[in-house]
Amino acid sequence: MPAMYLGCTFVLMEAFDPAGLIDVMIANDVTHAVLVPSQIIQLLADPAFDEAHIPSLEMVLTVGAPLHLEHKEELVRRMPKRFYELYGLTEGLCTVLDRDAPHSKLGSVGVPPPLYELRIVDDDGNDVPVCEVGEIVGRGPVLMPGYYKRPDLTAEAIRDGWLHSGDLGRLDEDGYLYLVDRKKDMIISGGVNVYPRDIEELVVAHPSVRDVAVFGAPHPQWGEHPVAAVVLDEEVDLEEVRLWVNERVEARYQKVGVVYVVDAFPVNVAGKTLRRVLRDDYLEG
């Protein structure tokens, strides 16, 4: 909306096409692009997506879902001083990682903008120590008054004036927010909490893997174990990928039991990967 008020030109495509989008950016001297992670990953597969080919581009903003660190680093390498990441909920909570943030903070999703507040709390609503994992809660000037005709959902989401996100994260000593996972996506293996995102960051570092989604599946001994659905850049022995990942995880309960290939991930309208759909399809198949 601010861009529209300033009279900016909007360039729209009928459907997303990586090569076509690059051509459109070049032909129209596009300065700002707002993309979801799955689109950025596809663009990074094209060597023409860099500052030399698209010199007009001043900002690449990723929204809708977390972008893996591996892809952030590649994007920053190709498009220096152009990367921004927005994390937030429509209900009224957000953080921004801007292009001037230190490289050491690239794994984060930034800090709250002015007038916004953020806390990390335990299940009882108490603040947790710096760098410890808890639920992300926040408030700010655009906090919603509630869900339409759903006082039950409103009471669950807003407690004591703070919006509970349902996301797990941690704040570092400088106030930068690091996303861990959705509470509902957490895997419990052998009684231990396992966060899919931690494993995904390892899997996507494999040279043959373009993208990954990890979810929990039933296991007769541990209750659940991690399963990795991958989109590949090239053919590879999946057992080799599984062993490669399991040599690098920090703990036994993070070891991946199964790796399998999909052409693409199911996503919602915001571009977020639907792990629950993947899990259901996997269990049915």
Question: Locations of the language-model features?
Answer:
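Adenylate-forming AMP-binding core of the ANL superfamily, especially NRPS adenylation
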Residues: 66, 104-149, 157
